[in-house]
Curated annotation (Swiss-Prot):
PROSITE patterns: CLPX_ZB. Keywords: ATP-binding, Chaperone, Metal-binding, Nucleotide-binding, Zinc. Zn(2+) binds at C16, C19, C38, C41. Component of the ClpX-ClpP complex. Forms a hexameric ring that, in the presence of ATP, binds to fourteen ClpP subunits assembled into a disk-like structure with a central cavity, resembling the structure of eukaryotic proteasomes. Disulfide bonds: none annotated. ATP binds at P149, T150, G151, S152, G153, K154, T155, L156. This is ATP-dependent Clp protease ATP-binding subunit ClpX.
Length: 453
């Protein structure tokens, strides 16, 4: 007779066609045409499908785009101050990704009977850049130029935007770029890094963000075109033109140098958002010369001393100032959105130390918590740290080195010390270079030993 298990001898035991478990080992067994699947296999398949869907590039209508107010609100959590720059960036990024929603969807590749992709009959048409068209109006992208002193938050703004929008993001250093054919990095290496950031998913890379830092360091050396070849200055600006505007960049599939017999990945840069940032040290003097009132003759106005600060001058920047600084007009025209960042004052630096989600004081508090101790930084100490950073002219970047220097001895000794409850940084620890206070636990046999470390 047939195999049976159970109370009824005529009952046939059913098994999952995928994992082989019997109907008695699982909660539910669902029947199909001559096959069965259990609830455990269904859960596993659901997880696999969700992971695969998460890896796919988001298509139109998949997710609502955050409004400029929401984008700025997210930036406020990580970046202190710079209200004008945040508002400018929020509008530019919102318009850019709203424009991407109107791009034609990529056509799926046709496969032959062996599963291999069939080449398009019209190769020229297949390589045309995708353009966003709404009611017959073609929408062009607006790349962004960030101008501000060092340590004012240019890079952090770009990083926060990319993290919020969940798009591929890459940072490039303009000082390492040279013209094609010379020792150094070609501008197309930037796109190669973007591809690496998204595991060579071309569709995803074509919607990414590229941040080119130190763009002011590739300015040409004078107002007039040089008679000698400037391969790391004006030459790089010329090479960046088509990449920033939009072109089909040929990128080696797995990096390395190009050679004639190599297959290339074609990446359309038309819909990649380029953000260029630089300190532009000395630009304020160019603006000051342009805005100063001068005259000739007995009734001429004698220009007085301009008391405006760097931040006030940078707000008045015009394309002609950037050209005089050394950027070529063609590149300036391809960076239509200009956002200036203000120089950080003492109050802003104190806020940077304590308020953002990943504030510097919170980071060191977390480090000391791992050793079983607390960290207290008094208000006077915060003010002293901010004043020291302003004196060094390093902006927010100088805050970490000052705080690190103050805590160096404590972090060296703390793992070897026992029963340290709290570390206190006061004004003397910063201004005079004194060591922080160590507060020991009170429930020990020894008395309160609050003293200098």
């Amino acid at each position: 007779m047939s195999d049976t298990t159970g109370t009824n001898s005529s009952e046939k035991v059913l098994y999952c066609s995928f994992c082989g478990k019997s109907q008695h080992e699982v909660k539910k067994l669902i029947a199909g045409p001559s096959v069965f699947i259990c609830d455990e296999c269904i859960d596993l398949c659901t997880d696999i499908i969700q992971e695969e869907i998460a890896k796919l590039p988001k298509e139109e209508g998949d997710e609502s785009l955050p409004t400029p107010h929401e984008i700025r609100g997210n930036l406020d959590q990580y970046v202190i101050g710079q209200e004008h720059a945040k508002k400018t960036l929020a509008v530019a990024v919102y318009n850019h990704y709203k424009r991407l929603q109107y791009l034609p969807k990529p056509k799926k590749e046709k496969l032959d009977k062996d599963g291999k992709p069939v080449e398009a009959s019209d190769k020229k048409e297949s390589k045309l850049p995708a353009k966003a068209i709404v009611d017959g109006v073609e929408l062009a992208k607006s790349n962004i130029l960030l101008i501000g002193p060092t340590g004012s938050g240019k890079t952090l703004l770009a990083q926060t935007l990319a993290r919020m929008l969940d798009v591929p993001f890459v940072m490039a250093d303009a000082t390492t770029l040279t013209e094609a054919g010379y020792v150094g990095e070609d501008v197309e290496n930037i796109i190669q890094k973007l591809l690496q950031a998204c595991d060579y998913n071309v569709e995803k890379a074509q919607r990414g963000i590229v941040y080119i830092d130190e763009i002011d360091k590739i300015s040409r050396k004078s107002d007039n075109p040089s008679i000698t070849r400037d391969v790391s200055g004006e030459g790089v600006q010329q090479a960046l033109l088509k990449l920033v505007e939009g072109t089909m960049a040929s990128v080696p599939p797995q990096g390395g140098r190009k050679h004639p017999n190599q297959d290339f990945l074609q990446v359309d840069t038309t819909n990649i958002l380029f953000i260029c940032g630089g300190a532009f040290d000395g630009l304020e003097k160019v603006i000051q010369q342009r805005t100063a009132k001068t005259g000739i003759g007995f009734n001429a106005t004698v220009p007085g001393k301009d008391e405006r600060g760097v931040s006030d001058l940078l707000i008045e920047v015009e394309p002609e100032d950037l050209i005089k600084f050394g950027l070529i007009p063609e590149l300036i025209g391809r960076l239509p959105v200009v956002a200036t960042l203000a120089q950080l004052d003492e109050e802003a630096l104190i806020q940077i130390l304590t308020e953002p989600k990943n504030a510097l004081v919170k980071q060191y508090q977390a480090l000391l918590t791992m050793e079983g101790s607390e960290l207290e930084v008094r208000r006077e100490a915060l003010s002293a740290i901010a004043k020291k950073a302003i004196a060094r002219k390093t902006g927010a970047r100088g805050l970490r080195s000052i705080l690190e220097g103050s805590l160096m001895d404590v972090m060296y000794d703390l793992p070897s010390l026992k029963n340290v409850q709290k570390v206190v940084i006061d004004e003397s620890s910063i201004a005079e270079g004194g060591k922080p206070l160590l507060v020991y636990k009170q429930d020990l046999d020894q008395p309160d030993m609050s003293k200098k470390a």
